[in-house]
């Protein structure tokens, strides 16, 4: 019996019918706290990694090797005043930052950390993740409109167009995973990658979806960078034109909530990419399967997050027309064509996804 099963059994015996509700709240709280800690140290890792790429040290003053820098940043933002523009729509202005964070947290309800370790093991998990993650764009539009600033509104309109453009390609990439796995349940999608010729010979990583669905994996990940408005797709907050875009009139914790949502969404995109294309909690080789699955998932997510940061430090920002062209004229045709190719592949004698 695992530790979680032991706690669950003991709690049920102690609290009776109230235990399921208490246990659900405890799990949600634990996941939320872990995500917040991950965001704090992801920001530190980003600053450190970019510093090394620029041949400098990065944060190294607060705590040993700068490890307490995230705590100092949080305290600074908590103590700053939230200044509201006089012409802003008061309630909408305050609701927008909260509305952008809530969907980012809500997606984690269906992401499995390892076998049987998921907050809500629903059969439509992939559909839920796609739907919830799309809500964030409304918060961005709301922030741009409520600020009553032409620069904020311009940034919000850019965000809306960019997110809609890349969500279509991302959706087709996920349709490919659905076709091959035959399920919307994220745990079952991971399970579908654990069989095949290579997995049968102990080389698990060659049976994962990244290899047969490589174009879809690339499209999904790059679209994820665009969806999160990360460099080089950060025209929403283009510093040289509209400064911080929809966040230009926000300060203090209201401003920090937008950044919190951005980094949570980065982790969500990486976790979904690892789950859908990189085998989730599955070990790359069978002889390493004794290591707990959550270790492999965290390692894959960390590697993908490092790619996010590497892209930021390497590529110049695209023009807005280039971003639209990439989404509509490159990614969309590639994913549609690959859906057709995989469809014929699955109907042929060479079908590698036979259940």
From Swiss-Prot:
It is an enzyme of class 7 (translocase). It is found in: Cell inner membrane. Belongs to the complex I subunit 1 family. It comes from the Bacteria. The keyword Magnesium does not apply. It holds the Pfam family NADHdh. One of its GO terms (molecular function) is NADH dehydrogenase activity. The keyword Endoplasmic reticulum does not apply. Keywords: Cell inner membrane, Cell membrane, Membrane, NAD, Quinone, Translocase, Transmembrane, Transmembrane helix, Ubiquinone. Its EC number is 7.1.1.-. It catalyses: a quinone + NADH + 5 H(+)(in) = a quinol + NAD(+) + 4 H(+)(out). GO terms for cellular component: plasma membrane. GO terms for biological process: aerobic respiration. The chain crosses the membrane at residues 25-45, 91-111, 126-146, 170-190, 205-225, 253-273, 290-310, 330-350. It is a multi-pass membrane protein. It comes from Burkholderia vietnamiensis (strain G4 / LMG 22486) (Burkholderia cepacia (strain R1808)). NDH-1 shuttles electrons from NADH, via FMN and iron-sulfur (Fe-S) centers, to quinones in the respiratory chain. The immediate electron acceptor for the enzyme in this species is believed to be ubiquinone. Couples the redox reaction to proton translocation (for every two electrons transferred, four hydrogen ions are translocated across the cytoplasmic membrane), and thus conserves the redox energy in a proton gradient. This subunit may bind ubiquinone. This is NADH-quinone oxidoreductase subunit H. InterPro entries: NADH_UbQ_OxRdtase_su1/FPO (IPR001694), NADH_UbQ_OxRdtase_su1_CS (IPR018086). NCBIfam families: PRK06076.1-2, PRK06076.1-3. NDH-1 is composed of 14 different subunits. Subunits NuoA, H, J, K, L, M, N constitute the membrane sector of the complex.
């Amino acid at each position: 019996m695992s530790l979680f099963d032991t706690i669950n059994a003991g709690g049920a015996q102690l609290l009776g019918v109230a235990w399921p509700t208490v246990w659900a709240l405890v799990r949600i709280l634990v996941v939320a706290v872990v995500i917040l800690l991950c965001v704090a140290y992801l920001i530190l890792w980003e600053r450190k990694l970019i510093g090394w790429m620029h041949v400098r040290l990065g944060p190294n003053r607060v705590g040993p090797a700068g490890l307490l820098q995230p705590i100092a940043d949080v305290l600074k933002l908590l103590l700053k005043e939230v200044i509201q523009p006089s012409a802003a729509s008061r309630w909408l202005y305050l609701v927008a930052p909260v509305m952008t964070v809530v969907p980012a947290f809500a997606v984690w309800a269906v992401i499995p950390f390892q076998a049987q370790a998921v907050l809500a093991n629903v059969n439509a998990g992939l559909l839920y993740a796609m739907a919830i993650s799309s809500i964030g764009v409304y918060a961005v539009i709301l922030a741009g409109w409520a600020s009553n600033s032409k620069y904020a509104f311009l940034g919000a309109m850019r965000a809306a167009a960019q997110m809609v453009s890349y969500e279509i390609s991302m959706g087709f990439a996920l349709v490919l995973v659905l076709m091959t796995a035959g399920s919307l349940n994220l745990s079952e999608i991971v399970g579908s990658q654990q069989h095949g010729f290579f997995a049968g010979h102990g080389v698990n990583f060659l049976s994962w979806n990244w290899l047969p669905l490589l174009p879809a994996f690339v499209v999904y990940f790059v679209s994820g960078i665009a969806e999160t408005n990360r460099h080089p797709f950060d025209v929403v907050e283009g510093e040289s034109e509209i400064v911080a875009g929809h966040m230009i009139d926000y300060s203090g914790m209201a401003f920090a909530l937008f950044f919190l949502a951005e980094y949570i969404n980065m982790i969500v995109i990486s976790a979904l990419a690892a789950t859908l294309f990189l085998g989730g909690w599955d070990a790359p080789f069978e002889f390493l399967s004794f290591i707990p699955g959550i270790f492999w998932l965290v390692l894959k997510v960390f590697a993908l997050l490092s790619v996010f940061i590497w892209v930021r430090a390497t590529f110049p920002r695209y023009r807005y027309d280039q971003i639209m062209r990439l989404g509509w004229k490159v990614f969309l045709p590639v994913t549609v064509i690959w859906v057709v190719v995989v469809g014929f592949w699955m109907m042929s004698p060479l079908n590698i996804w036979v259940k």
